[in-house]
C-alpha cells in the first residue's frame, strides 16, 4: 500500500514471477516473535487476524527498516514491483501466501496490540489506523481479491473487525474505522470506487443502514 503522510496506505499484490530466481530476500528464514519489538520477524498474532479475515491460513512478516530497504532493492532489480516500496506499507505475494508489512505498519499494529495505546488523535492515531487498514487490505488480497479498488473497499468495511481482533474496544475500533473511511478519498484513483458506499455494489452488508 502506498503511504501518504501517515493518513492512507496503499497495498500491492505482487505478481508471480515466472522468471524469478529460487528465492528473494523477502523469503529468508525469520524468527517467530510477538510483542513490542521492531526486529524482522514472523508475527503470529497478526497472522491469526489475517487468517481470520482471509478465511485461509496467512503468514504476516514484519520487517525492520534495513530489511525493508533490501527487499525493495531486490524486488525492483528482478522486476517484482511496479513501484518503489519506499511509498508502500505492505504487499502480498500470491506465490506463497505471505503478507509483508513495512516498519511503520508493524509499529502501528504493535502500538494497538501490545502497547495498548488508544490515542484520540494525532500522529500515533493516524499510524494505528493506517496499520489496521493495511493489514485488512492485504488480508483481502490473501482471500483472493486482486482488483485494488475492490480490495480496499472491503478492507475499509473490515477495519472495525480487524481492530477488535487486535484487542481494541468497540468504541476505539469504531474510531479507527471512521478515520480510515475519512482518509479513503486520499488514495490513488486505482484504489477508489464510486460503488464503495452505503448501499453500493461493494457494500458487504447492504441490509444494514450504516457505513463503513
Language model region names:
Residues 1-4:
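Positively charged n-region of N-terminal signal peptides that target proteins for export
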Residues 7-15:
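Bacterial N-terminal signal peptides
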Residues 32-37, 120-125, 138-145:
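Second-shell loop/turn segments in exported
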Residues 60-62, 144-150, 164-176:
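Surface-exposed patches in mature extracellular/periplasmic domains of secreted proteins
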Residues 61-63, 105-107, 152-154, 195-199:
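Sequence contexts marking disulfide-bonded cysteines in secreted/extracellular proteins
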Residues 129-156:
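Active-site recognition of the HExxH zinc-binding catalytic motif
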Amino acid at each position: 500500500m502506498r503511504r501518504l503522510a501517515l493518513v492512507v496506505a496503499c497495498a500491492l499484490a505482487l505478481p508471480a514471477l515466472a522468471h524469478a530466481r529460487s528465492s528473494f530476500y523477502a523469503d529468508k528464514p525469520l524468527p517467530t516473535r510477538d510483542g513490542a519489538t521492531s526486529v524482522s520477524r514472523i508475527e503470529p498474532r497478526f497472522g491469526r487476524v489475517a487468517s481470520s479475515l482471509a478465511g485461509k491460513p496467512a503468514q504476516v512478516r514484519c520487517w525492520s527498516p534495513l530489511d525493508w530497504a533490501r527487499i525493495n532493492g531486490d524486488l525492483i532489480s528482478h522486476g517484482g514491483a511496479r513501484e518503489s516500496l519506499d511509498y508502500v506499507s505492505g504487499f502480498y505475494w500470491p506465490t506463497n501466501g505471505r503478507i509483508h508489512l513495512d516498519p511503520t505498519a508493524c509499529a502501528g499494529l504493535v502500538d494497538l496490540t501490545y502497547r495498548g495505546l488508544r490515542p484520540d488523535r494525532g500522529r500515533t492515531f493516524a499510524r494505528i489506523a493506517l496499520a489496521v487498514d493495511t493489514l485488512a487490505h492485504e488480508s483481502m488480497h490473501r482471500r483472493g481479491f486482486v482488483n485494488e479498488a475492490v480490495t480496499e473497499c472491503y478492507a475499509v468495511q473490515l477495519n472495525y473487525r480487524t481492530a477488535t481482533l487486535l484487542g481494541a474496544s468497540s468504541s476505539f475500533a469504531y474510531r479507527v474505522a471512521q478515520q480510515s473511511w475519512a482518509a479513503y478519498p486520499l488514495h490513488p484513483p486505482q484504489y477508489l470506487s464510486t460503488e464503495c458506499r452505503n448501499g453500493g455494489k461493494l457494500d458487504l452488508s447492504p441490509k444494514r443502514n450504516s457505513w463503513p
